[in-house]
Amino acid sequence: MKERAAFINVSQENKLSIAYDAPTRERLSAALDFLPGVLLEEELPARKEELREVAYLFSTWGMPALGKEQIRAYFPGLKAVFYAAGSVQGFAREYLEAGVQVFSAWAANAVPVAEFTVAQILLAGKGYFQGLRRQERQGRAAFDSYSNTFPCNYHVKVGILGAGMIGSRVLEMLKAYDLETLAYDPFASDEKLQALGAKRATLEEIFSQCQTISNHIANLPAT
């Protein structure tokens, strides 16, 4: 007999259809018995009885932040939450304290984020963003004139704050370019930064020397 599972989110649409496409849902349904539709927080009281058997919850961006008592009341049989996105800081603590395991797709989510970040760094190195605003106001010649004042991405310094999953991928991808990367991360070892082609630096050094800086430090009291 299949264990019960459900999708939960703040809305019926949201990002669920992107994170869980049709083939993914088919594979999940082959192993688990899903409740119909998407659970919304406001529906939980009315569906309390059928939720008692739910062992697994699946979500992504838009995961409701339930309290520990709500979790225990509505999902007494819950074993795990699978979150198809990155950070779980907004909701995970209450589940963990209720004895529920939380799994995140933080490693997979880091791939497109790192790709996007590298693209932005390379564009910033050409003065693209400021130049575009000048072009909108003064025409293409203003863009070219401003962009030509930038050294582009050849032998310039780029600062990366944080060498976690995303920051590490960014540093690894930047090794393909003739850049000098400076990294600030008090938790990363010298060996790790060296393998990523980065030089350890202080915040003061990065902000005083680097043309472009990309921040990947979690917004937490500890960091």
Where are these regions (language model features)?
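An N-terminal-biased, well-structured beta-alpha scaffold segment characteristic
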Residues: M1-F103, S208
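Hydrophobic Val/Ile/Leu positions in short beta-strands of Rossmann-like dinucleotide-binding domains
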Residues: F7-I8, V158-I160
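Glycine-rich Rossmann-fold phosphate-binding loop(s) that bind the pyrophosphate
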Residues: A163-G164
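Short gly/ser/thr-rich secondary-structure transition/capping motifs
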Residues: G37-E42, W61-M63, E136-S145, Q194-R200, ...
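Conserved beta-strand positions in the Rossmann-like core of class I SAM-dependent methyltransferases
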Residues: L182
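Rossmann-like adenosine-cofactor binding region
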Residues: A65-L66, P186-T223
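N-terminal Rossmann-fold NAD(P) dinucleotide-binding loop
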Residues: G167-S168
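Phosphate-binding beta-alpha-beta segment of Rossmann-like dinucleotide-binding domains, i.e.
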Residues: V100, A105-K157, E172
